[in-house]
Amino acid sequence: MSIDFGLSEEQLALRELAHDFSKNEIRPVAAHHDETGEYPWGVLAKAHELGLLNTHIAPENGGLGLGAMDGMVIAEELAWGCSGIGTAMEANGLAEQPVILGGSESLKARYLSPMTESGRERPIMCAYAVTEPGAGSDVQGLKTTAVKKGDKWVINGTKMWITNAGVADWYFVVAVTDPAKLARGGMTAFIVEKGWAGVHVGKKEYNMGQRCSDTRGLTFEDVEVPEENIVGQIGDGWKLAMAAFDYTRPAVSCAAIGVARAALEHAAQYATERKTFGQPIANHQAIQFMLADMAMEIDAGRLLCWKAAWMKDAGLRNTKEAAMAKAFCADVVMKTTTNAVQVYGGYGYSEEYPVEKLMRDAKIFQIYEGTSQIQRMIIAREMLSRGK
């Protein structure tokens, strides 16, 4: 059995494309979008024309059909530029993935194919609408319901912390269709369009970090959804919602590595320029150890991401490995950005320097797509249930 830690020529080209895009299009406007919270439509439009959006949609629906490993190299570079803008760009993938996995060909043609079309005034966006005010980590506690009435399903309920909610054209929604079963076949997934009667979009949340990412609540009030907008089969909602994470958690983890890498680069450069006691602080062992720890943990995290992605591309179950990558990389980015601020000292606490933004942006990685504590529960469950 051979092991290859290198990227293919195609993946190297993807990484170069994404890195150059981040350097030239994302980083120059990152501070503006952080300060204003303005959604980065201009950046997204350019990314869409380059093919950096919706990369996992299959060729038969107009996409590139990229694999999980391909997505890793793109996600890291986009987040290296700005994780807030990167999240705005990558959020489509979480809503698309359940449709890719379980949607009918008709559903894919209606909702995925238009997302790959060029020449639009703005890209079509979508959002994964599962979390609720009382059901975050505990997805089995969902209260949103869908009741069959005639040839339609009527949805009522509230969703919370939905990324892209205000800009999305459609939502992947999970609702309870059989309260007696819940996660064991009692939840069903639907595609709900933003413009339908009864869909109400809440106010934008102004968060600690990743401020240009559009996060809002959604309320569904007697929203009528046609039968053909069910994703998969009745009762597949929980399964599809969770299956998507095996694809997206490695990418989110690699995005965390992109932020950590940016923090390390800034800290290392500053350490060579800042002088104390007549020499650069990089000459002091205390600083060297901090930088060395950052570098070790970033490389270790990236390898966890790559393994989880490789397993998914190989058709192997990667739930445990995806959770390992997510938990480890989320903690790494929080530690790395915090230590980058420490290397800068008082300057690191100032908005005039880049590391305070990176530290604010980092925290959410320990929360969204499953908290670090939930990831550890998943890891333990997988280990104990499978005996390995």
Question: Predicted segment positions?
Answer:
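Hydrophobic, small-residue-rich alpha-helical packing segments that form membrane-like cores
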Residues: A135-D138, W153
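A short core secondary-structure module
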Residues: K152, N156-V201
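Amphipathic alpha-helical segments in well-structured domains
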Residues: G71-A75, N92, K108, L112, ...
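N-terminal glycine-rich flavin-associated loop
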Residues: G86-S106, G136
